[in-house]
Every structure is written in structure tokens, then in C-alpha cells.
Amino acid sequence: MTNWDLPPVGTPSVICFLDETGVVAQDAHFAVGVLTVPENSDLPTQVRKFRQRSGWTGEWHFSKLNEKGLRVFKGLIDVLRDHSGWSFRLTLADRAALDVAEVCGDRFVAYERIAAQSVASSMVAGTQAVVLADEYSTPDTVRFEEDVRWCVNSEAGGNVVAGVVRVTSDCHDLMQASDVLTGALVYPYRQGRSRSGKRPSAKRRLADYAQAELAGRVPVSPFDPSWVALPGRAR
């Protein structure tokens, strides 16, 4: 029998929904957020029920938020607030502190390393993860799925990530929830404080609402340069 390095039978699984915002080699702030739930979570059901109650048939995308959609976006935050079975971690790369793309020598490697840190910080002890990552266009030579899995497993010293696959955001409501959380948490870093005397935008109000309603549950961590130093996977 092949001696594969596999976790024990019955190891609990978690699903990680990974989304990014920004252009890593261009924007002042680039971030990767990961929403994690157990495989038996009823959070998807609760989000689906809210979608049905609210009559919302579109996708939740922070970048497309306007006044008309603010109520239903806040409702999504309320569903998350009222549910305990999830976690969210966001890794923020600030180019003023460290230009990750320049240090890595490649913007796609930079994205992989930032994503790997977010996934690693999302891992739950004694579990194995499957990562669903929002579709991100890369050249054919970039093996994002393999590289992120290798980086996280190498750092953990075991098979904590079973696989990574890129999917479109319309495949799952929680992929869209990860998009909303990622965008809302990064927004204040990009836009600064609200201007006094001016009505805040819908995005600003949702960002403030998410911070208030999910206080302590959506930590933002700076990118750790040690992920750059992690040896690359053998080609």
C-alpha cells in the first residue's frame, strides 16, 4: 500500500472562501480575506433564507454597492452577526510598508504568498481545509492552486489544506459574503476618515456597520514578510 501523508480518517473538514481586493503591484493596499466555516455549517442555509426573504436575486459585491442595495447588504452582515459558526481573517499588504510584488519579483507570487498567509491564519486545529478562491486571471504558467496549498502545508508541516480551486463568485453565497467583508474592511484604509458635513457613501456606511456589528470577529493582520522568505515549491 502506498504510504501517503494523509490525515486520519474522520478528520473534520472546513471550507475556506477566499477573496481578494486590489491590484497587488499597483494599489497602495491589497488584501486577501478568508471566510471559514465547518463543512456541516448551516450558515449557507441562513444566508439563502435571508436572500429569499429579502427578494435579493443579484450577487453581493462590495464594489457594486449603492444606496439602493445598502439595506440588503446590511442584512447580510446581520446574518453573519447572528451566527457563531464562522471565522474571518484578512491579510493586508500596505505598499508603503512593504512592496510585496517588488520583493517577490513577481506580482502573482506576491498574491500567492498573501493568500497563503490568510489561509494559514484561518486554519482550525485538528481540521483539514478545502479552499475555494475567487477567480483571478493569471498566465498559464502560474499554478496558484498548487503553490498556495504547498506554502500553507509546508509552513504547517502537514496536509492541513487538501486542495485549492478557483471558482466564480456566483457559485456560492459565502464567496460573495467573503467579498463583502474583504471590501468593507479594506475600505477605511483606502478612503481614510469620513469628511465632516458630507453624507457618507453607501460603501462607507456599510464599512462602518460591519465594523460595529462584527467587532472583534473580523481581525485585520499586516502581511508578514516571513512568507516571502518561504522557499518556493520545486518545479
Pin down the residues of each PLM region.
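Phosphate-ester processing/binding pockets and catalytic centers
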Residues: 1-235
